[in-house]
A protein has these predicted regions:
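Active-site-proximal cap/loop segments of hydrolase catalytic domains
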Residues: 1-152
């Protein structure tokens, strides 16, 4: 499974709650809602919560993918722009480091230099696709690989 921004949050959340997928890619995610509040350039996050994080820290914790990182067994790649102000790279770094510490699955952190919340440079757009294809190809089962005919 794969998602970016809000979809990146959902991807990280889902792999913390199921073993259904063979691989996942979480792009530009919010991983820790509590720390996100003080590092993002946006304020739309507040409409998803009833209170500020210092007023109800538990609500922010249970809605954060980081809270469920110990459950993740799906190989998960995390991809973010180094200059992203909407979902700062610190969110991706926090998740990547936690996945490494838990040691239950393979993980990779891809940092896009000088990129913001979307990739502006065509070379980075192409690079994203190459990373995605390589990651998902790596975790396809042998049976599904045999089912796909080779291109000549």
């Amino acid at each position: 499974m794969c998602g970016g921004s809000g979809g990146g949050v959902l991807t990280a959340w889902i792999v913390g709650h199921t073993e259904r997928f063979r691989a996942a890619v979480s792009m530009r995610p919010v991983i820790n809602w509590h720390s996100f509040v003080g590092t993002t350039d946006g304020n739309n996050w507040y409409h998803q919560f009833r209170k500020y994080p210092w007023e109800d820290p538990l609500e922010y914790a249970v809605r954060s993918p980081l809270h469920y990182v110990a459950n993740v067994t799906t190989p998960t790649m995390v991809m973010t722009g180094e200059a992203d102000l909407r979902t700062p790279i610190s969110q991706s770094e926090e998740y990547y480091r936690a996945l490494k510490m838990v040691r239950k699955t393979d993980t990779l952190l891809v940092r896009m230099p000088e990129e913001f919340h979307g990739w502006r440079r065509p070379t980075h757009q192409l690079l994203q696709q190459l990373y995605l294809m390589a990651w998902f190809e790596k975790y396809r089962t042998q049976a599904s690989k045999a089912a796909v005919p080779a291109l000549d």
